Design a protein with these regions (language model features):
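Structural motif
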Residues: 142-153, 223-230
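Gram-positive cell-envelope targeting signals
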Residues: 1-84
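Short solvent-exposed beta->alpha transition segments
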Residues: 40-41, 65-118
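Short, solvent-exposed S/T- and G/P-enriched segments that are highly enriched in secreted/extracellular
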Residues: 157-176, 232
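Structured interaction patches on ligand/partner-binding surfaces of diverse proteins
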Residues: 108-125, 187-216
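Conserved "repeat-terminator" motif of extracellular CCP/Sushi domains
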Residues: 134-138, 207-226
Length: 232
């Protein structure tokens, strides 16, 4: 009898341990599921898009610029507004496009009719090595310039100027997909010139833009009054 009692007690203890382990395992699954839902709701592409959409709807271009910026690449609010204005001019609903990407493929790119890459969603780091984070990304313009002017120089910003080689293609580097005002200086046969010029992303194709600055000779035709051409 004592042996039977001890066996029964052992079986009861074993069952209690199993129940405890299963309960602990179930609780752990619930915790992990909750954490998974929490982090997916705070790191998913919809969260990133929502922040940008909110800034766009409030016309907070400074915040838009902050979202578009990275540690090595900073946008200004003027550039951010220019990019949004360009997409509007091309009848691109950036809010709809990004939301569609976030809900379907999670990553993707918004393009225009000329195959310019404008804005997109891409994978970033993984939180705790598990939960995928996403970020808004932009794509630069690769700009070149050609000119027939002598001693040409193009001032692309307050701190940057580039000497343009005559009758050659000069690389100006990569810039944000946004309009910008620039200053062109050079020489022609009749003397020095200095003119304000504009970088217009609408002229770009496949994220490449070539700026042409040429002086042209034109024949000027003048008609004089009859009394001037036939003096008496």
């Amino acid at each position: 009898l004592e042996q039977e009692d001890s066996v029964k007690k052992g079986e009861k203890k074993g069952k209690k341990k199993k129940v405890f382990l299963f309960s602990l395992l179930g609780l752990l699954v619930l915790i992990l599921s909750g954490l998974g839902y929490y982090f997916s709701s705070t790191t998913g592409p919809q969260v990133t898009v929502y922040k940008l959409v909110t800034a766009i709807e409030h016309k907070d271009y400074r915040e838009v610029a902050s979202i578009l910026s990275s540690e090595k690449d900073k946008w200004t609010k003027e550039e951010a507004q220019s990019l949004l204005d360009y997409m509007t001019s091309q009848k691109i609903d950036v809010i709809y496009e990004l939301d569609h990407i976030a809900q379907s493929s999670k990553t993707g790119i918004v393009k225009d009719k000329k195959q310019n890459l404008l804005i997109g969603i891409e994978k970033a780091n993984k939180k705790f090595g598990i939960f995928q984070e996403y970020r808004i990304t932009t794509y630069p313009l690769e700009v070149t310039a050609t000119t027939n002017l002598d001693d040409a120089k193009l001032k692309t910003s307050e701190k940057e100027s580039t000497v343009l080689k005559k009758n050659q293609t000069t690389k100006l580097g990569k810039v944000h997909f946004a309009s910008r005002d620039m200053q062109l200086d050079g020489k022609t046969e009749v003397g020095k010139i200095s003119s304000g010029v504009k970088l217009d992303p609408a002229q770009a194709s496949k994220n490449k833009l070539n700026l042409t600055f040429n002086s042209e000779k034109r024949l000027l035709e003048v008609e004089f009054p009859e009394e001037v051409s036939n003096p008496t």
